[in-house]
Amino acid sequence: MRYLNTKNIIAAGVLLSCMSSIAWGAIIPDRTRIIMNESDKGEALKLTNQSKNLPYLAQTWIEDTKGNKSRDFIVTVPPMVRLNPSEQIQIRMITQEKIAQLPKDRETLFYFNVREIPPKTDKKNVMQVTMQHALKLFWRPKAIELEDDGVMTYEKVEIIRRNDGSIRFNNKMPYHVTLGYIGTNGVTMLPQTQSLMVTPFSYANTQFKNVPSTFQVGYINDFGGLSFYEINCPVVNNICNISVANRDQ
């Protein structure tokens, strides 16, 4: 059986508001990213078998940012489950004692992996393809948890337009910042199915150049949608002016 690993596609930024744009297989999760707050001690996610005819197995596990499987900080329960046609089940993510060793002043990134395993077929000369996906899982320590109705704002991300027209994003926040849109008039300059993620208290530069002095950015928020901001950069190599755009999807 061949395994088709789509982690690079998903992690690169297909985690946008429209799940229909993602090439999920039969098994789909109920969200495109996971936020785990320290005070909650765990989180739950629903998986649905979209097939109306076939049962599937779903295998789940946690990986670190280097792609290593890990049970030290978070475990999935159950790690393997059968879903009958059109069935929906719940997967729990439970923190372990070692979670206390993670930084208290910033998010830690993990990946929640789900692999769907189809039933064996009696047909000859048929290759079965098993889909595997990875969702970003952000563990958020108590010191930086948002209120229940809190909405992430991104004004603390400094944006600088450089001489060559490339853009630098200085992330002054304790959260991972993911850009799903950089462009003008609804046309993104990001390569297709890609995004740009800036880790807490760090910076990242765009690989593309010649960005105009006025443009928009869309940050992927906690709900998987895009929060848009208007950017105006009258002077190169200086911090740009930022204001909330009149749309939020």
UniProtKB/Swiss-Prot annotation:
A single cellular component GO annotation: outer membrane-bounded periplasmic space
Organism superkingdom: Bacteria
Biological processes annotated in GO: cell wall organization; chaperone-mediated protein folding; DNA damage response
SUPFAM superfamilies found in the cross-reference section: PapD-like, Periplasmic chaperone C-domain
Signal sequence region: 1-25
Subcellular location: Periplasm
GO MF terms, alphabetically ordered: protein folding chaperone
Keyword match Magnesium: no
Role: Could be required for the biogenesis of a putative fimbria.
Family: Belongs to the periplasmic pilus chaperone family.
Record-linked PANTHER family: FIMBRIAL CHAPARONE PROTEIN, PILUS ASSEMBLY CHAPERONE
Protein name: Uncharacterized fimbrial chaperone YqiH
Gene (UniProt): yqiH
